[in-house]
């Protein structure tokens, strides 16, 4: 799989997260669950009165730092969730470009090879199904470490 094809997969997931018609999609449900349960995303984001470009760059740098040492499906879902949360703060006229840029950061961070070697989109869906059972507290067991790691890295970026 080429990195461009992988980026397109990520971009399509982010687009589905912005569109309410895909609420039965397990990846979209997992992303929305993380955003809903961790409204702290908004509180930890920098002052987004900054231009859209700076928002995307900040988010992208945080994404790249998230998988610096290891990658797992929890971190991938956390990156998708954080990106979707940021996209909610962006005006409609910039969303297409922002979605493309964020998907580029995620695809660079995760890597097409890692994605394929770990089962691709099918495994991502299976992971999301496994963390989205009837008991919503199971989501916490898988995503809290990944989300918190991403947020700590963001705070580190803010300090620099």
Swiss-Prot record:
GO terms for biological process: regulation of apoptotic process; symbiont-mediated suppression of host apoptosis. InterPro entries: Bcl-2-like_sf, Bcl-2_BH1-3, Bcl2-like, Bcl2_BH1_motif_CS. Gene3D superfamilies: Blc2-like. Transmembrane segments: none annotated. Signal peptide: none annotated. A motif (BH1) lies at residues 64-84. It comes from the Viruses. Keywords: Apoptosis, Host-virus interaction, Inhibition of host apoptosis by viral BCL2-like protein, Modulation of host cell apoptosis by virus. Belongs to the Bcl-2 family. This is Bcl-2-like gene 16 protein. It comes from Saimiriine herpesvirus 2 (strain 11) (SaHV-2). The lineage of its organism: Viruses, Duplodnaviria, Heunggongvirae, Peploviricota, Herviviricetes.
């Amino acid at each position: 799989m080429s990195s461009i094809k992988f980026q397109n997969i990520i971009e399509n997931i982010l687009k589905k997260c912005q569109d309410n018609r895909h609420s039965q999609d397990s990846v979209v449900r997992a992303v929305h669950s993380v955003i809903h349960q961790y409204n702290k995303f908004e509180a930890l984001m920098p002052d987004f009165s900054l231009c859209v470009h700076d928002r995307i760059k900040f988010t992208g740098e945080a994404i790249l730092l998230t998988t610096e040492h290891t990658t797992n499906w929890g971190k991938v879902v956390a990156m998708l969730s954080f990106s979707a949360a940021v996209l909610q703060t962006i005006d409609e006229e910039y969303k297409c470009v922002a979605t493309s840029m964020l998907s580029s950061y995620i695809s660079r961070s995760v890597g097409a090879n890692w994605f394929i070697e770990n089962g691709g989109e099918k495994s991502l869906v299976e992971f999301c199904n496994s963390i989205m059972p009837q008991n919503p507290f199971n989501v916490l067991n898988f995503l809290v470490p990944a989300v918190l790691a991403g947020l700590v890295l963001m705070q580190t970026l803010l300090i620099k």
